[in-house]
């Protein structure tokens, strides 16, 4: 298997982040020409080019990711239960290999591309490279929506969603999101079923190697990225967050940027949550501001902006991706609860009047803060 290999000063990068694929530039409501340094909206996703997706179709039902070293199943079969996905992987000899597994949420998220676009419940352009991967939609003939096409990961949420559901994280490559999905479908009184794609290879992928540099920064030598150790305790809209990171000077470095969606998701710690560890879903080497939820309850943690626009809805350029390091809360049946799980990836409007937020949106009443927090990133020099 061919794999590109990168090194830092301390060794091989084992967790290379695949770029989002974004090449267009956006304001709060339009496609724009590429901003220059000092311009409004400079520093967004397309400003910086990372490890570009590079796949090989092996002609045997498998796809090699030449960046991550992971080997993937090309096709998706029928929807299946969480347990059935493990049985399928254990019994598979696809491509002549017998060490297939259910991917972790970080492995699975390595495949997402934010060149996709969704239109509410209808699919548009998928958030995965369809030149290599077959991605099914929800079956509208049985009452599903096209976006009901979620993919299981092996990552079990350490908390619970919906006031008691055992929850598994998954990626939706039709609408471009991570959330926690119930293991059991209460309405059908049966195990929940979702799509599934097997993986093998690079068992170090998704494992961080954090070092506290003692100067307000944290290096992850698995990804080759250096992070701002502590947020500054302030919420900002998207444009202001881009500018904050671009102008940040910290530990003698001035090349900080707002991380893209895949970079920021790489530092989520899915073994932690407010419910179970009384902490954000991030390694305690980082410092994270505690906030109150929209009802004034303490013990929550912010959503953090990324530089990535999320193309969704009638005004597709108006929202950007965030990662929830606290609970992914929503208000359902007039009750505020964790509906998506700490570590979910959703999107917020890029801008709005402060006195109108937080508010609630969509069928699960997603909390919208708009004024989200920032943790800046830079690339470690090789």
Task: Mark where each language-model region is.
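Sec-dependent, cleavable N-terminal signal peptides
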Residues: 1-12
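Glycine-aromatic-enriched surface loops/turns that form tight recognition elements
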Residues: 10-101, 105-256, 262-382
